[in-house]
Amino acid sequence: MDIELTKIKKVYFIGIGGIGISAVARMFLKEGKTVLGSDVSDGEVVHELREAGIVIQAGQGIDLVPKDVDLIVYTIAIENYDPAFFTALQQQPIPIRSYPQMLHLVTEGKYTIAVSGTHGKTTTTAMIGHILRKVNKDPTMIVGSLLVDEKSNFVAGNSQYFIVEACEYRRSFLNINPKILVITNIEADHLDYYKDLKDIKDAFHELVMKVPEDGFIICNTSDKVVAEVIMDAKAHIINYLDFYHARELRIPGMHNQVDAAAAIAASVQIGVDQTRADIHISTFPGTWRRFEYKGALASGTQVYDDYAHHPTEVVATLEGFREIYPYGKKKITVVFQPHLYSRTKQLLEDFAKAFGQADHVIVLPIYAAREVDDGTVSAALLAEKITHNHVDARAVDSFDDALNLLLAHPFGPDDVLVTMGAGEAYTIGEKLLKKY
C-alpha cells in the first residue's frame, strides 16, 4: 500500500524512544501531525519527546495501539524479539512501516547525503550538518544522537539537502537512495544478524551501487575492505584523506580528526568552500554521549560519558582521553556496559585488549537489548580477559553494586571517570554527580 505523507494526520510510533525512530516522530510533530507512541523503556529520549508534547505510553502490546491512526511506525527490533506482537501488528487494518522504510519515504525526492560505516557515523553526520547550516545551506538532518545545541536528533531545514545517518543493521540503509554516500569505515559488527565480514561487505556494496553516476562516494580508498566494496561503483570516488590535516577541534581524538576530514570532503562536493568548512568545523560542539562532559564530583574528579560499544571505538575514545589526560597526570576509571551478548562473544578478545589506556575498568552486566543470554559470555568473563591484559578490572552484578563500589572509591582531583557503552551506563555517572 502506497503512502502519501501529506495525507497522514495521525501517527503512532512503537519503540518511539529509539534514537533513530524518534527523529521521524519529531519531524512529523514539526509538520503538525498528531504524534503518539509507546516504549518499554523510559530514557532521556522519551523524556525529551514528552517535553515536546508527545503522549507516550509505557510498555508494548497490540492493546496499546490506537485504532484511529493513519499510520503505524515501528522499530525493526520487534520483528525479532517480539514476533507475536509483530504478527498481530501486521494484521491491523492500518498501514505499517518500519523506521528504515520511513527513511525512504521522508528522503524521497531530496538531495540525500547518507553517512554510513561501522564507527563515526553520528559525529560525521552532525559535522556535515554543522558546516552546511553555518554556510546557510539549511539542510534537514536525522542524526543518531542528540545534537548539543538543539537537544534534538532532528533538525528541520527548507532546502533540498537531507543529511541522514545510515545504519547497516539488518541492511536498513538500503532503503535510502543517496546522492552523496559517506563510508567512514567497515568492520565486523552486528554479528547477531550478519554472518561475517563478507556478508557486511556485500550489504555495503549493494548500497554503493545505489549511488548514481553524478553522485559521490566519500571514503578512505586506502582501506582494503572499503576499496573492495567500492570497486564497481558508478559514482565519483572521493578519498576523504585528501582533506585530512591536524585541525583545531573542540573534541579530542584522532578518530574525530578523520571524521572531520570526511565531513569537509562531503561538504565541498556540494559547493562549500573548503576554507570556510575548515573554519566552521572548529566550532563543532559534539553530540550527546560522544565524549560528553557530565560534570565534576566534589572531590574534583571529572566525569564523562561516551557511547563507545565496539573495541575499535573503545580504543579511539580512550586515546582521545589520553590526549588531554596523559599517563602520570590522571588516572582513568572506565565503567563499561557491554552491548549485546553476540557482540561481546564474537569480539571478546578484541574487547579484552581495548582498555589498555585505562587504569581501572568496572564491567556492568551485559545489555541484552533484543537478545537472550545463552550462558556462554558474561561481564565476569570479559573482566577476567581484561585483567589478563594487565589492566585492573572487575565485574559487578548490578548497577547498584557499581554505584556502591564507586562511592567507596577514594576519587580525587587526579581521577577521571568515564561511563561507556550503548546502553544505560551513563546513569551511573549522573547518579554519582547527584550524590557527591
Stretch-by-stretch model annotation:
Residues 3-4, 27-30, 50, 64-67, ...:
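Phosphate-binding loop of NTP-binding sites
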Residues 2-10, 20, 27-31, 244-360:
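Nucleotide phosphate-binding/pyrophosphate-handling subdomain across enzymes
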Residues 402-434:
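A glycine-rich beta-strand to alpha-helix segment
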Residues 33-40, 217-221, 333-336, 358-368:
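Short internal beta-strands
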Residues 67-71, 160, 412-415:
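Short acidic/histidine-rich motifs immediately flanking catalytic phosphotransfer sites
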Residues 302, 352-413:
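C-terminal helical cap/extension that packs against the catalytic core
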Residues 1-98, 102, 252:
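N-terminal leader/targeting and accessory segments in enzymes
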